[in-house]
Curated annotation (Swiss-Prot):
The lineage of its organism: Bacteria, Pseudomonadati, Pseudomonadota, Alphaproteobacteria, Hyphomicrobiales. Keywords: Aminoacyl-tRNA synthetase, ATP-binding, Cytoplasm, Ligase, Nucleotide-binding, Protein biosynthesis. GO terms for molecular function: ATP binding; glutamate-tRNA ligase activity; tRNA binding; zinc ion binding. InterPro entries: aa-tRNA-synth_I_cd-bd (IPR045462), aa-tRNA-synth_I_codon-bd_sub2 (IPR020751), aa-tRNA-synth_I_CS (IPR001412), aa_tRNA-synth_I_cd-bd_sf (IPR008925), Glu-tRNA-ligase_bac/mito (IPR004527), Glu/Gln-tRNA-synth (IPR000924), Glu/Gln-tRNA-synth_Ib_cat-dom (IPR020058), GluQ/Sye (IPR049940). GO terms for biological process: glutamyl-tRNA aminoacylation. Catalyzes the attachment of glutamate to tRNA(Glu) in a two-step reaction: glutamate is first activated by ATP to form Glu-AMP and then transferred to the acceptor end of tRNA(Glu). It comes from Mesorhizobium japonicum (strain LMG 29417 / CECT 9101 / MAFF 303099) (Mesorhizobium loti (strain MAFF 303099)). GO terms for cellular component: cytosol. Belongs to the class-I aminoacyl-tRNA synthetase family. Glutamate--tRNA ligase type 1 subfamily. This is Glutamate--tRNA ligase 1. It is an enzyme of class 6 (ligase). It is found in: Cytoplasm.
Length: 474
């Protein structure tokens, strides 16, 4: 086996790239990057009834959006079926596997007999020492591995530790069906060996498969890759992750306005940590990650924590970089396509200028769309219910004075100049600053919350600001 680390991510294209699969891909990718190795991608599309091209495209799109690139071309497991058959037949020639010729009815009777005795349903090995010459006419044979019947099969797992499986519990399982198609258990081993995979990192729901796959490795005389079975993700209530907990495709998280780097940061910390470090860059994660540091216990998914991490990433990101990501994500966000359709160089510059204030109040890009909506609004500005309460008759009277003070401003129209003018007006009129700033905010944005009102004035510019205020006092 190569000294260079080779990991692989091997999803089944029967649906979207769900959040658990994304974390598995991330751990494989991080470990490969951390060790200077490579991560391969294999599409396990042997289930022809459920595998779809649309699901494959969704998985590739999800990985690309997250920035989890793979090395080389994606491999189709289905297209490697001839190689899987070749290895199964080689095992028969080596005496490590054999043909069995039971009919479905015979297999069901075997299972019923085991259940009647209170035993788990297992194949009884009746064709283990017989030859194909004894095969009944018209029955196609399946190939079964000759599993060891004594001792233990040991899986040396870097997360779960040493896991022992009594060989008496491993029956002679099928590796090639009677129709000539390989089983998943067999195809995975052949593919991992041929692709040079040195480290298998996957969910711990595959742990029981590891023993049977080890039997195939040993039968072929192949090195068994290092195995790491990571804990599954549960909901915040400790129950198995479901859609109500967040078991969604990564495209749903893009539509909810999460940054790829923030989502990766959050997923990395589901089962792994680095001291007290909570907010991590991709560079940090690559530098610090080691699969041996992953916990055994199930991790709990918490949307509130994800939002907090996403907000932290937005605030620490350079404004120009955040703007680029925001614009690229607009087609996927609620209200985003309409905003994207109105983008031009002028309001892009306004948006960039407003970002320092906007990102302080937003935890997601969806909230950023909502916060930035005032920049794209057309006059007369729609005013929401809370903002309307700030525009009563007394407030409109104060607005008239504020409009006059701002209109009298000479020189550059800046946040500092606007603030000085409004403060002077408030002081001269005996008003508290908030009594002036709140109706100003409502008039300028149509909302009761926004970035600092003086920043809003600066971003909108003199002409638009004065016009919006005038709309509320005329």
């Amino acid at each position: 086996m190569s000294d260079k680390v080779v990991t692989r991510f091997a999803p089944s294209p029967t649906g979207y790239l769900h959040i658990g699969g994304a974390r598995t891909a991330l751990f494989n990718w991080l470990y490969a990057k951390h060790t200077g190795g490579t991560m391969l991608l294999r599409i396990e599309d042997t289930d022809r009834e459920r595998s779809t091209a649309a699901a494959t495209a969704a998985i590739l799109d999800g990985l690309s959006w997250l920035g989890l690139g793979w090395d080389g071309d994606a491999v189709s497991q289905f297209e490697r079926a001839p190689r899987h058959r070749e290895v199964a037949e080689e095992l028969v020639r080596m005496g490590k596997a054999y043909y069995s010729y039971e009919t479905p009815a015979e297999l069901e009777a075997m299972r019923e007999a085991a259940r009647a005795k209170g035993l788990p349903p297992r194949y009884n090995g009746q064709w283990r020492d017989r030859t194909p010459s004894e095969a009944p006419a018209g029955v196609k044979g399946a190939i079964r591995i000759k599993a060891p019947t004594e001792g233990e099969t040991i899986v040396h797992d870097r997360v779960q530790g040493e896991v022992r499986f009594p060989n008496k519990d491993l029956d002679d399982f099928i590796i090639l069906r009677s129709d000539g198609n390989p089983t998943y258990m067999h195809a995975v081993v052949v593919d991992d060996h041929d692709m040079g995979v040195t480290h298998i990192i996957r969910g711990d729901d595959h742990l029981t498969n590891a023993a049977r796959q080890t039997v195939i490795y040993n039968a072929m005389g192949w090195d068994v890759p290092s195995m790491s079975h990571i804990p599954l993700i549960h909901g915040a209530d400790g129950a198995k992750l479901s859609k109500r907990h967040g078991a969604l495709g990564v495209e749903a998280y893009r539509a909810m306005g999460y940054l790829p780097e923030a989502l990766l940061n959050y997923l990395a910390r589901l089962g792994w940590s680095h001291g007290d470090d909570e907010i991590m860059s991709i560079k940090d994660m690559i530098s610090w990650f080691d699969i041996g540091d992953v916990n055994k216990g199930a991790a709990r998914f918490d949307f509130a924590k994800l939002e907090a991490i996403n907000g932290a990433h937005m605030r620490r990101m350079a404004d120009a970089q955040l703007l680029d990501i925001f614009i690229a994500t607009l087609p996927y966000l609620e209200g985003g396509p309409a905003m994207a359709a109105r983008l031009n160089e002028h309001n892009k510059a306004q948006l960039l200028a407003a970002l320092p204030g906007l990102k302080e109040r937003a935890k997601t890009l969806v909230e950023l769309v909502d916060g930035a909506a005032f920049l794209f609004a057309t006059r007369p500005l729609p005013v929401d219910e809370k903002a309307a309460l700030l525009l009563n008759d007394g407030a409109r009277k104060i607005l008239r004075g504020a409009h006059e003070a701002l209109n009298a401003l000479s020189g550059d129209w800046t946040a500092a100049a606007a603030e000085a003018a409004v403060r002077d007006y408030a002081l001269a009129g005996g008003h508290k600053l908030g009594a002036v700033a709140q109706p100003l905010r409502a008039a300028l944005t149509g909302k009761s919350t926004s970035p600092g009102v003086f920043d809003v004035l600066a971003v909108l510019g003199r002409e638009e600001s004065l016009a919006r205020i005038a709309d509320q006092i005329d």
